[in-house]
Amino acid sequence: MKIALVAHGDNPPYLKELFNGEGFELVEKECNNEKEYIDLLKDADGALVYLNPLTTKEVMEHCSNLKVISRGGVGVDSVDLEAATELGICICNTPGINTTEVADHAMAMLLSLTRKIREQDALVKKGYWADRTELVHPYRSELGRIAGNIVGIVGLGNIGKSFA
């Protein structure tokens, strides 16, 4: 069975070992337009796609062996679901794969804004911390704290719950 992996620069190296070890043929190629997708997928039984997949009706119509498209990401809005259904192609995704990372990033941004990390980092890089502390001290009194405050979370989906 041939599996096509649309490369995006940093595919995990173990994928080839994993698939080939199970009797699959994994073919990896970077694709930037529909023609390249068709060339890669035309003989494939399955496709692993990640960033900005061009899984349009035209692409799928040219891939008569294609049985499944697995989207390495949360959404499937980049896949023509109507065409896939019409052509009998199963569409999969990886819900929740980035929930923790997005929640952690939101917390990091909150801390960065509250503690003025960017501004203070710039001052330190200019050497103000060591020899011109009077330029840094005004920021110290303006630094916010999260402790004792209420943080509002808009939306309690997977990411909002993880953030909480």
Regions found by a protein language model. Name each.
Residues 77-89:
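Rossmann-fold NAD(P)-binding glycine/threonine-rich loop
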Residues 1-44:
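N-terminal glycine-/charge-rich "phosphate-binding" loop or analogous flexible N-terminal tail
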Residues 159:
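Hydrophobic/small residue at the entry helix of a nucleotide-binding pocket
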Residues 29-30, 72-73, 88-100:
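Short beta->alpha connector loops at strand-helix junctions that form conserved
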Residues 5, 151-153:
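Hydrophobic Val/Ile/Leu positions in short beta-strands of Rossmann-like dinucleotide-binding domains
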Residues 40-42, 60-63, 146:
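A short, aliphatic-rich alpha-helical micro-motif
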Residues 87, 95-150:
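Phosphate-binding beta-alpha-beta segment of Rossmann-like dinucleotide-binding domains, i.e.
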